Design a protein with these regions (language model features):
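N-terminal amphipathic/basic-hydrophobic helices that include classical n-h-c signal peptides
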Residues: 1-19
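Class II aminoacyl-tRNA synthetase catalytic cores and aaRS-like
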Residues: 13-244
Length: 244
């Protein structure tokens, strides 16, 4: 069963978010072929990034004053193409930044290729000088761009995200893509355990790995979870107490 309160919502979720509609897959395949023709490959081995988005935003005033050309790379999170101009937001591991494509700077052919082939979820590299929009948003005026990876399945949009709790747990990768709150929790946990490990390591403590599955259950009165190892034809127990 698919999530949603109404059958129509379930069907829409199945077709769009999970990418199970054949016409969507075929359209993406056509766009992939166009990108391959234009760039030689839609999945290059390297990118020429000079700044993370957070770094470009932090150093914005200096970059603007010097007229420095920067290159950022990341996943397209939003896209607004309007004929001879277009805006998009690129997100990397540090944050998100807006890019601007125009006929004057980017070139009409490059804009048309971007509009015809790039979708939310794709990875791109954008190069240009920074400027401030009329709405005071720090933006890159794109002089050149290229694809770094074509997403062959649609992802949940930035506005709606992935709201269904069951699907968020089942498809954790989509949850991390769509919901910054979930991603923030994972990052905080990672920093916490890194800090604990560093603190103890600097004081001479040794970290050891203990078995996850055991032949003999431990943990005093606690009832262990049991599983069967088919290849060994043996029962194993999930560890309860790490210290035992």
């Amino acid at each position: 069963p698919f999530p949603g309160e109404k059958p129509k919502i379930r069907l829409l979720y199945r077709e769009i978010v999970l990418g199970m509609r054949q016409d969507i897959v075929e359209t993406k395949q056509e766009k992939l072929e166009k990108l391959t023709t234009a760039f030689g490959t839609a999945y290059p081995e390297q990118c020429g990034r000079t700044h993370m988005t957070a770094q470009a935003i932090k150093c914005f005033d200096a970059l603007l004053a010097d007229g420095t050309v920067v290159t950022v790379a990341g996943r397209v999170k939003s896209l607004r193409m309007m004929g001879k101009i277009g805006f998009a937001h690129i997100e990397d591991g540090s944050g998100k930044m807006q890019i601007f494509l125009s006929e004057q700077t980017t070139g009409l052919d490059a804009i048309k290729l971007f509009a015809d082939t790039i979708e939310i979820g794709d990875f791109v590299e954008a190069t240009g000088k920074v400027f401030l929009t009329k709405k005071d948003e720090k933006t890159i005026d794109v002089a050149a761009w290229r694809v770094l990876g074509k997403s062959m399945r649609p992802i949940p949009t930035e506005h709606f995200g992935l709201q269904d709790e069951e699907e968020r747990l089942r498809r954790r990768y989509l949850d991390l893509l769509s919901n910054p709150e979930t991603r923030d929790i994972f990052m905080k946990k990672n920093r916490f355990w890194q800090t604990v490990r560093t603190f103890l390591s600097e004081r001479g403590y040794l970290e050891v790995q203990t078995p996850v599955l055991e032949h003999i259950p431990g943990g005093a009165e606690a009832e262990p979870f049991i599983t069967h190892h088919n290849a060994l034809d043996q029962d194993f127990y999930l560890r309860i107490s790490l210290e035992l």
